[in-house]
Amino acid sequence: MVSWGRFICLVLVTMATLSLARPSFSLVEDTTLEPEEPPTKYQISQPEAYVVAPGESLELQCMLKDAAVISWTKDGVHLGPNNRTVLIGEYLQIKGATPRDSGLYACTAARTVDSETWIFMVNVTDAISSGDDEDDTDSSEDVVSENRSNQRAPYWTNTEKMEKRLHACPAANTVKFRCPAGGNPTSTMRWLKNGKEFKQEHRIGGYKVRNQHWSLIMESVVPSDKGNYTCLVENEYGSINHTYHLDVVERSPHRPILQAGLPANASTVVGGDVEFVCKVYSDAQPHIQWIKHVEKNGSKNGPDGLPYLKVLKAAGVNTTDKEIEVLYIRNVTFEDAGEYTCLAGNSIGISFHSAWLTVLPAPVREKEITASPDYLEIAIYCIGVFLIACMVVTVIFCRMKTTTKKPDFSSQPAVHKLTKRIPLRRQVTVSAESSSSMNSNTPLVRITTRLSSTADTPMLAGVSEYELPEDPKWEFPRDKLTLGKPLGEGCFGQVVMAEAVGIDKDKPKEAVTVAVKMLKDDATEKDLSDLVSEMEMMKMIGKHKNIINLLGACTQDGPLYVIVEYASKGNLREYLRARRPPGMEYSYDINRVPEEQMTFKDLVSCTYQLARGMEYLASQKCIHRDLAARNVLVTENNVMKIADFGLARDINNIDYYKKTTNGRLPVKWMAPEALFDRVYTHQSDVWSFGVLMWEIFTLGGSPYPGIPVEELFKLLKEGHRMDKPTNCTNELYMMMRDCWHAVPSQRPTFKQLVEDLDRILTLTTNEEYLDLTQPLEQYSPSYPDTSSSCSSGDDSVFSPDPMPYEPCLPQYPHINGSVKT
């Protein structure tokens, strides 16, 4: 029985041969194809696979019937009889098979009316793969002859091969790192993993070091192979080193995925050019062909029901993926009209998309009416002079109209205080289908400017005073509000703790601890506008158990105070980190033992509460746009409350490469459509909710640790997603993956998430404590490697940025306790 390792090796070799076994194609040559060439029936089926041990005989039988002539090819090259190859009828026999006989074999049966091809995939296995050095055909470049008398320290001989530092590849693939170097005397090479010596016993299956090629080879990589690999080259005159980072992506095998809408229907005129594009995504090496549907004797299908097809373009030995994904047709004729198909296959299956080409007759050129060049030039000059004259008259008229006599302030004995009312308009974040009756253009305050005399000051002073309208429903007396200690500084102000007497109308004489948002001393008009907009947004949203609710405001006779609910246990991210068990590799404080150990049900409860809060915001047509654990607060009774949903954000001026004050990148919570197209919807909030779930089940982990922003953009476009957290069931992880669906319409709604989480929470017992100290399974497709955990104490071993207090949120003391609904 073939072992799993040999089976994986077979699949890899098979897909490699698929990419090499297609004859090269030139479109210019295709235009000269003889029209009487019989069409080929394309066999859309799984090729037969043969596995032969070295030294054995390989025998293939062509299963095609009624063949006048049978011809054989290997990797697109015709096969003839020799001392090892025997051709007898429909049989092909190769004696003493070697690994070089591996490849793609095809038999073609030529008939009087058509031809048909049958494909075989052959793999001659060997104990040690002979393909380790397939990329080393240019190894002569790495060997540098040194003059014996020219002693020198090590140096790199081929830096072009070392430019790609970050390598992301699917699991079970082979990875090779190279460090071509020279030096005299001859240098030695050692490899380190994560700064420590890399030994054979550190990896199941070991690894290979090819000193003559300065390379490290790891076969069948798994998630535990993630990390930094450093080659250290040294001799007695010095040493040099180079580091690669490997990220292993565990993904389920699937047939090729073709981008929707490609290739697209096209139309052109006779003599024009056209191109069809086919975007193929596949973990395994895909084989791509371009096919045209043709007719034979007025029929598109043969007697057996199979369509008549002609292969126009296929991958050859020197063809790249980018070249094969585009089909160019030059100097189009009416015969080129018809249906074209892009077909891609791998070892899992086949996918195809079709498009139609419509050829139109060339338009008849109308007789050009040419005006006299003299009259045309005169007309241009006249129009230009007229436009310039109009501009000059307009400028003079505007200046005469706006010129007024300026007041002489030096003759006035008193100082004038400028009282300015800031023009604010409602800046609410609502979806396009919002049916709110409140007009977003209704002005909150109209601008007025007046000069008032005061004789107490000796010189002019410009003082801005903000006059806001009073809202009786929300206005709270200042004399009943006692400010306390600061809790933190926000984006446009600060937050302090306070005691509000009578803010709870059911208990008019009882003091309630609240949080008060206010402007800083150096606040600008924009800061005031943002704070008022947030207050107005919270008024419109209303109250819910799982959001930070507005309690009141002080807008008259003093600075603006916005009074909101107080959450004593701070933000959710630090709340989870403070409750990480001791001994956990990424423990927040390894010397502190938590008073209560969190259960799996506690984490599900956190997720359920936040889903309820987002369901309510979505029902109020509110799009959050910055949903993350740092923007969730926890109350004394462990109730999750979503914060900062009313902040005004300028989505057109986001610096996607700029870190926040705590060193983390907000783009890691953003959906692809928000990241690349700046489209914010409820579906983009669902994506962020999936990342928030991942933060919860990693107990405050940082998403995509150590991945640069540029690489993150690339990985998201390629379909990469984060692995399953340790403390997460497959059902919850699939819920995260649904939230991260590339198509926004395919993501679940918050209503569906609430229903699913409610069911999971009901079936979960209270005794399921988190056992985070157990080692992770090295070959599990959903568990990351413990040696390179994605949630280390400082968020990432690759990002040494410090973690100060959260921006826009207060810092609260941590109080242990389980999470309850």
Curated annotation (Swiss-Prot):
Sequence ranges assigned to domain Ig-like C2-type in this UniProt record: 25-125, 154-247, 256-358
Modified positions (Phosphotyrosine) in chain numbering: Y466, Y586, Y588, Y656, Y657, Y769
Extracellular face of the membrane: 22-377
Region described as Heparin-binding: spans on this chain: 161-178
Family annotation (Gene3D superfamilies): Immunoglobulins, Phosphorylase Kinase, domain 1, Transferase(Phosphotransferase) domain 1
Gene Ontology BP term (one): organ growth
Active site: D626 (proton acceptor)
Membrane-side (Cytoplasmic) residue stretches: 399-821
This protein's UniProt keywords: Apoptosis, ATP-binding, Cell membrane, Cytoplasmic vesicle, Disulfide bond, Glycoprotein, Golgi apparatus, Heparin-binding, Immunoglobulin domain, Kinase, Membrane, Nucleotide-binding, Phosphoprotein, Proto-oncogene, Receptor, Repeat, Signal, Transferase, Transmembrane, Transmembrane helix, Tyrosine-protein kinase, Ubl conjugation
Record entry for activity regulation: Present in an inactive conformation in the absence of bound ligand. Ligand binding leads to dimerization and activation by autophosphorylation on tyrosine residues.
Sequence segments annotated as region (Disordered): 129-151
Domain notes: The second and third Ig-like domains directly interact with fibroblast growth factors (FGF) and heparan sulfate proteoglycans. Alternative splicing events affecting the third Ig-like domain are crucial for ligand selectivity.
Identification of the protein by name: Fibroblast growth factor receptor 2
Taxonomic lineage from the root: Eukaryota, Metazoa, Chordata, Craniata, Vertebrata
